[in-house]
Amino acid sequence: NPKVILYDIKKIHPNEIYYFSGQSSVGKSFFNPLETYKSNIELPFLILEFIRFNKLFKIKFYNSCSTDSFGQTAKIFKNENDNFSPLSPYGNAKSFSFWLTKYYRETYGLNCKSGILSNHESPLRNKNFVLKRIIDFARNRKKNQILKLGNISIYRDWGWAPEFVEAIYKINNAKSKKDYVVGTGKIVSLKYIVSKIFKLSKINNKFLQVNTKEYIRPNDIKKIRSDPRQIYKDLKWKSKL
């Protein structure tokens, strides 16, 4: 409830705000773009405007953006200077939230920043996300059960969420008001991950079905890799993966 959130901000006067809410599934965003746009743009907009209007300039606001905003271009290695060219409603929404945050920082002087995060995983990951689905399948598989996946020939920069939280805290508390790309700087294919998990779990590949229609996205990024050198240079953060 936006009204409740804004009321709490005015009442508590927090030192820091971290916006992690919003529909975050790329696949789901194709089927429910309205929810994706509203949840990733509307509330950050309201919070930023509330901070500006009430002159709460001491608040440090962090907006969580995504490397999905970069889309598919010839250059795979993405840094803070690369243009956005998103292929999904999710990527579009995150792009908008990035520019919105940057606008309020540069125009109104708010202490607000974005982290452009690559994929990151943890045990808390929603069961509908692909790596969580693969791991849950391997752990809880029933006899003759088949794992259905979409395109597994994609490459992603997969990181560890607890590490990324450290980077996020550094970004929001840095003296400089800058946005940063956060990732491992390495890529691995989904196909490789599936094969590793199946091998470790001693599951025959005949129980894997790929290119399943319900999991194929209308548009998908083939390869994307983060270039996190700037955050290491400025804030001394680096993934241990």
Task: Please state what every model-predicted region is.
Residues 131-132, 138-241:
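C-terminal substrate-binding subdomain of Rossmann-fold SDR/epimerase-dehydratase oxidoreductases
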Residues 1-120:
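N-terminal Rossmann-like NAD(P)+-binding domain of SDR-like oxidoreductases, especially those catalyzing
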Residues 3, 125-129, 188:
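Conserved catalytic/ATP-binding subdomain
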Residues 70-73, 123-125, 189-191, 220:
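A short beta-to-alpha transition loop/helix N-cap that caps and shapes the active-site region
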Residues 41-49, 128, 162-165, 169:
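Conserved active-site region of classical short-chain dehydrogenase/reductase
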Residues 82, 86-93, 123, 127-131, ...:
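The catalytic Tyr-centered alpha-helix of NAD(P)H-dependent dehydrogenases
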Residues 44-52, 102, 133-137, 191-196:
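Short, well-ordered amphipathic alpha-helices
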